[in-house]
Structure formats: C-alpha cells, structure tokens
C-alpha cells in the first residue's frame, strides 16, 4: 500500500513539477522563518537575561530612605541611614536570607606610574562575587574573609579599567595607588555582558574589602545592602521582614515604603522572562503565518490533483477501492509534501544557525555580544514539526475528503 502511495505521489510531482517546486519552496521558506525566528529570539532572550543577571543575580538592593509616616510620636521626613552592622543584624534575624553584603561606594583615583584614572570603587564582602557575578579570571581571585578581617589593602578590578591602567601587563600582584594609598591587585574580573547598569558597568569597577574601605575613608553609613533570599519566590516575605527588623531599630512604621528603597532584581527577572515569552510568541506567530501561506499552496496543489484524477478515482472506486484508501492517499501526499519542504527548511536553518554560532563574540563585534547566539532547541524543533504536521494534515484532509466523496458513476464520465 505504502509503495503505491509513494509511486502515485512522485507521479503527481512529475505531472505538476513547477507547481510542486513552488509549493516546496514556500514550505521550506516558511519552515526557515519559524525556526530562525524562534532560534534567534531564544538566543536574544537568553543573552538579555544573562546580561541582567550579571548586574544582580537574584538579589535585592536595600537603600536608606526618608520616613513618609509618623511613628511612635516621631515626625515623618526623618532620614534612615544604615550601617554595616545592619547586615549582620538582618542575617541573624531573617533565616530566609542566604547572602548579604554591606556596600560602600565612591569615586576614586587609581594611579600606576604616570597613568591615573578615576572610576567607581565599592567596599563589599566576599558574597558580592556571586551576587554580582564578578568572577575572577585565571591566576586571580576575588576578596576573601581574611581580606575583610585583616583590612587588607587589596583590590579587584574590572577588565576594562585594568587594561586602561596596565595595558598588556598582567595586573595580578601589581601595586597601584588608590587615592595615594598603595593597594595590591589580587584579581581581574572575567569579561561579561551587562544590560542593567548598577551604578555603572562592572568592567570599569574597582572593589575592595568593606572594612578597608571604611578605614581608608572613614565612612559611617553604608550606601546600600545587597540581599539574596535563599528562595527567590519568597522575596516579598523577605522584604517585609527587612522593613520589620530595620523599622524596629530605626523606629519607623514597617508599612512605610518610603523609609527604605529596594531595587528588586528578582522581580525584574520575572518581568523580563514574561517579556521574553511575549516576544517568542510574537516571533512564532510571524513565522506561523508564513508557514500557513505555504499550507494554502499545498491545499491548492492537492485540489488540482484531485480534479485532474477524478476519472482515475472513479475507476479505483468502481473496482472496489474503499473511501478510506482514497482519503489516506491524498492525506499522505500532502503530509509527504510538507515533510520534504520541512526537512529542507530544517537543514537550511541548521546550517545558518551553525554558521552564526561560529562567529566569535570578540570585543569588536558588539552586536553579537548583545544578540547572543541562536539556540536550536528541542522545543523549537518539536513545535515546528508539530505545525508542519498540522498544516500538512489540514491541507490534505479537505481535498482528500472531496476525492473520497465523489460518485464513481459520475467520475467515470469525467474527462
């Protein structure tokens, strides 16, 4: 049976070569549109998410604010200024906090030989490395607990600021001046893309132990606290607990949202994922419409085939062919047509994606750094295959139903 179906299929292709080729091209192009749009969209979404997480990975940044409500006999409008001990206080009082770091911040002048440059410097603890994804490159390290305890004059640099200062020299182990105070470089951050600017790009940032920062500059108040909940889904509860604990210490209403400012990267991540899903749905819809137009072409070819083979169908039915056989014959031809065009489209898309993924993400190709690499995922393959099968089935079903419903006597008269 299947051999006969294949034979009839290729006979129809030869009989309607031009129409069949145009239909195959349309299906191929539609498949390419769906696969490439989804793959590039997924790659872009992954890269944008990576860039956002590189500025803050599941963290909340807590800033001191100004009270907006009267509380316990105190007027509103009082400033709330946090100190580094608040980090320990919150860590002890809120078990659902996984990591927390005080954060001092100011502009400093870095000098090496005759070269000097001004950049932002932060005083933090070792948790900052993971929370801000500031991972060291080879032969270097981030700050550790001993650096904090001993108030060591050590510095961790972003790759761009390090290159500006040291050019082609290896900075690790080198001494430089930070506002005329000698520091030793212990590590250089790995290059990373950062789409959310948290007080400037990390590639141009200098980082030192918060204890050293406080000793060097005499800061009393921290600029902010970085907090990572152990369970990101509990961020609202952690926020409430932060307001409760600090409200008790600084005597403000725990419901006073103006007393503290919180930059919630977890919520931003959720919103970004929803936006990414919306973009993927839009791109799929565009590709699907292209593929749907190709499906109309398949249906058109099948209707022409049914019309031209009406006499043949009548003969088959007159000698005992069942309607189910006639139905399956034309559905098979439509599905096989979609399969050939879809396979060609898949192979072409795979070639394009493979070629694009071979392009290096060097410093000179900024577009690739932000667009990311296209991802040909299993979900994309299955979704495209499912759409192709559905379009092929629908494109073949209605012409096949028409073929199976013809009257054998009338069809034998058809020329």
Language model feature labels by segment:
Residues 3-4, 400-415:
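Short cytosolic juxtamembrane segments of multi-pass membrane proteins
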Residues 3-10, 14, 18-26, 33, ...:
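Transmembrane alpha-helical interface segments in multi-pass membrane proteins
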Residues 10, 14, 42-45, 49, ...:
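Alpha-helical membrane-interface segments at transmembrane helix boundaries
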Residues 42-120, 127-131, 145-146, 163-164, ...:
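Hydrophobic, regular-secondary-structure patches
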Residues 55, 350-382:
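Short juxtamembrane loops and helix-capping segments at transmembrane helix boundaries
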Residues 126-143, 152-253:
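Mid-to-C-terminal secondary-structure elements
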Residues 226, 239-242, 253-287:
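Peri-transmembrane interface segments
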């Amino acid at each position: 049976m299947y051999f006969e179906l294949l034979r009839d299929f290729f006979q129809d292709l030869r009989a309607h070569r031009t129409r069949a080729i145009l239909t195959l091209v349309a299906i191929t192009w539609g498949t390419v549109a769906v696969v490439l749009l989804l793959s590039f969209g997924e790659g872009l979404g992954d890269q944008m998410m990576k860039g956002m997480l590189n500025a803050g990975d599941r963290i909340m940044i807590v800033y001191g604010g100004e009270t907006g409500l009267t509380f316990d006999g105190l007027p509103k409008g009082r400033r709330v200024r946090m100190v580094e001990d608040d980090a320990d206080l919150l860590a002890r009082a809120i078990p659902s906090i996984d990591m927390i770091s005080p954060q001092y911040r100011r502009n400093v002048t870095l000098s090496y030989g005759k070269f000097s440059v001004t950049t932002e410097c932060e005083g933090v603890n070792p948790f900052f490395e993971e929370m801000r994804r500031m991972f060291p490159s080879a032969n270097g390290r981030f700050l550790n607990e001993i650096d904090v305890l001993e108030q060591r004059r050590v510095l961790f640099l972003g790759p761009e600021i390090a290159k500006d200062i040291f050019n082609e020299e290896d900075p690790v182990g080198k001494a430089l001046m930070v506002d005329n105070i000698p520091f030793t470089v212990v590590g250089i951050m790995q290059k990373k893309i950062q789409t959310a600017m948290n007080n400037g790009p990390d590639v141009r940032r200098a980082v030192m132990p918060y204890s050293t920062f406080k000793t060097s500059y005499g800061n009393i108040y921290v600029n902010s606290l970085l907090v990572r909940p152990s369970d990101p889904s509990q961020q609202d509860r952690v926020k409430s607990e932060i307001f409760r604990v600090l409200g008790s210490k600084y005597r403000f209403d725990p419901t006073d949202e103006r007393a503290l400012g919180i930059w919630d990267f977890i919520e931003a991540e959720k919103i970004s994922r929803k936006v990414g899903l919306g973009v993927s749905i839009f791109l799929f819809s565009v590709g699907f419409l292209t593929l749907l137009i190709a499906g109309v072409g398949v249906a058109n070819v099948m209707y022409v085939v049914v019309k031209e083979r009406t006499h043949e169908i009548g003969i088959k039915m007159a000698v005992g062919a069942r309607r189910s056989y006639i139905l399956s014959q034309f559905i098979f031809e439509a599905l096989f047509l979609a399969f050939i065009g879809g396979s060609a489209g898949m192979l072409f898309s795979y070639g394009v994606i493979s070629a694009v993924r071979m392009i290096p993400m060097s410093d000179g190709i900024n577009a690739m750094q932000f667009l990311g690499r296209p991802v040909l995922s299993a979900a994309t393959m299955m979704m495209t295959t499912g759409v192709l099968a559905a379009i092929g089935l629908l494109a073949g079903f209605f012409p096949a139903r028409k073929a199976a419903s013809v009257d054998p006597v009338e069809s034998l008269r058809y020329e």
